[in-house]
Amino acid sequence: PELAAVALSADAGYFGSTPQACVHYLARQVHALGQAGDVLLLMTVSGNEASLLDAIEAAHERDLIVVALTGHTGGAVAAKMREMDVLVCVPHERPARVREAHTLLIHCLCDGIDVQLLGEQEL
């Protein structure tokens, strides 16, 4: 079965002449595209980007579940998470190691979704 996924973008068209436009570009996309029950997947090393924090607030306003892959302690993102959200902190401070772990986690997540939708494959 098909499973829709949309990559939110930092397209230059979202940036206006004000600094606020740079912060709110992800939240505006979440408001426009997100529906209750959807999942917002975030990947961040520091967990302190204002645009991501704003996107989490927008997701909660629209009743989305937030899955956040972060580095170290999760930063400010960790504080924004709700009970139904999922926070996975990679306990490392080097950005390259955190991103490598995020890549592995995304592959595992995709495999898990495939199993849920399609069942176990015979080897």
What residue ranges belong to the model's regions?
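Glycine-rich phosphate-binding loops that contact phosphosugars or nucleotide phosphates
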Residues: 1-122
